[in-house]
Amino acid sequence: MQDITQAEAIHWLATQQKITFLTGAGISTASGVPDYRSLKGVYQGIQQPEYLLSRTCLKTEPEKFYQFVKTLYHPDAQPNIIHQKMAQLEQMKRGKIVSQNIDGLHRKAGSQEVVDFHGNLYECYCQTCGATVPWQDYLLSDRHADCHGQIRPAITLYEEGLSEEAIEKAIQAVASADLIVIVGTSFQVHPFCDLIHYKQPTATILAINQTPLFLQQPYYFLEAKAETIFAELTIKE
């Protein structure tokens, strides 16, 4: 790990042509969405949070699963400066985004090709008939009005495998980057943190976080709130 200055980090973001962002829940806290493991996070005070987001809970205690998942929705949350600047870089073909987040804020900010590695809360479907169901309907009932099947969000639960398409797209995004920027994540959840092994030998890793990461590879570290850095970033056409 090597520390860098805020000015250096901003310069890299402003000038690099092939950036891939690996993002986590920490980038959405400025939008009012709590992260998972901080003191104010979603899991605080809840016993067995992983169980509540597991396939077993969905199948055996669907009501308990449903009541917990509903607390993860923040439909009034708006993208912040981090999402907005990343979307701008994506639209200029300079940035790609692979996100652990299921809050949909990257897409809300205008990102078209974000890889939702763990899925999206705002995409729901009926497990019985396969129909797409508006998330607004899901928040009213987890039973499909047409067939009475169980509705669920299209997110990856504990005990479930990830989408092959998401994995392939994420690997491609990392492998094509000259600069990989890790933002708002402790980078400890597998297989998300394993994506870094697909980077080019010449690619640079930059972590913008409030605590250092445990990476086996050399990386540059800026201890900062990401929203502060992205607010200072000027992107020229």
From Swiss-Prot:
Primary location class: cytoplasm
InterPro entries attached to this UniProt entry: DHS-like_NAD/FAD-binding_dom, NAD-dep_sirtuin_deacylases, Sirtuin, Sirtuin_cat_small_dom_sf, Sirtuin_class_U, Ssirtuin_cat_dom
Amino acids binding Zn(2+): 126, 129, 144, 147
Gene3D superfamilies registered for this protein in UniProt: SIR2/SIRT2 'Small Domain (3.30.1600.10), TPP-binding domain (3.40.50.1220)
SS bond partners: none
Top-level taxonomic group: Bacteria
Catalytic activity entry: N(6)-acetyl-L-lysyl-[protein] + NAD(+) + H2O = 2''-O-acetyl-ADP-D-ribose + nicotinamide + L-lysyl-[protein]
Subcellular location: Cytoplasm
Top EC class for this record: transferase
GO molecular function annotations of the record: histone deacetylase activity, NAD-dependent; metal ion binding; NAD+ binding
Binding site for NAD(+): 25, 29, 37, 100, 102-103, 118, 185-186, 209
Active site location: 118
Cited PANTHER family: NAD-DEPENDENT PROTEIN DEACYLASE, NAD-DEPENDENT PROTEIN DEACYLASE SIRTUIN-5, MITOCHONDRIAL-RELATED
Function: NAD-dependent protein deacetylase which modulates the activities of several enzymes which are inactive in their acetylated form.
Name of this chain's protein: NAD-dependent protein deacetylase
Species this protein is from: Enterococcus faecalis (strain ATCC 700802 / V583)
